[in-house]
Amino acid sequence: MSFLNTYNLLLRATQRVIVLTLFATALVMAGCINDEKHTPEDTTLVNVGDTAPDFTVKLLNGKSTTLSSLHGQVVMLIFFSTECPDCQNQFAEIQRIVAEKEPSFKVLAISRGESIETTEEFSQKYGITFDVGTDPDRSIYDRYATLYVPRNFLIGPTGRVEALTIEYDYDQLHAIWEKAEQMSK
């Protein structure tokens, strides 16, 4: 057997091992991603019909606000992470909606587990014009859910959760936004 034939056989064998390794890795990763123990629904602590837990949050403008101080108003409470691609897409869409028409309800976004500086950079990047706060230790977020962002909670004037969405979906975002507009008329 010539050197070239031996080389080609080794090359093909190596390629097969690499392909099989990648395939096996993909199967393992798919199993982790689809782990039924961590579905968005199972990680939700506050559901439609529940009273939204009160909290105090520090806003990027330096002031603080409480959810209870917004009692009587319709509130869209958004939990997000600045590094989450779905959150970035959602904020780009929300800011586009807000630029077309100022919402008739209160929008309050809270970054989960991030610093004021990181959240300010994100807010500036997306040109966010509504209130944004930070929850660096996740103490607020952990009262509402255990995993997954973005999460949008539509809270009615009585403090009850009227609707919620988990992760970014264009149609769901527009549906909950429209419901907030209808409720605040």
What do these predicted ranges mean?
Residues M1-A52, Q172-E181, K185:
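N-terminal targeting signals for export/organelle localization
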Residues Q124-I128, P136-E181:
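Thiol/disulfide oxidoreductase modules built on the thioredoxin-like
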Residues A52-P53, V75, V149-R151:
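Short loop/turn microsegments at loop-to-beta-strand junctions
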Residues G72-V75, P103-K106, F130:
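Loop/turn elements at helix/coil->beta-strand transitions in domains of secreted/extracellular proteins
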Residues T65-Q88:
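Short active-site neighborhood of thiol/selenol oxidoreductases, capturing the structured segment around
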Residues Q88-Y126, P136-R143:
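Structural microenvironment flanking redox-active thiols in thiol-disulfide oxidoreductases
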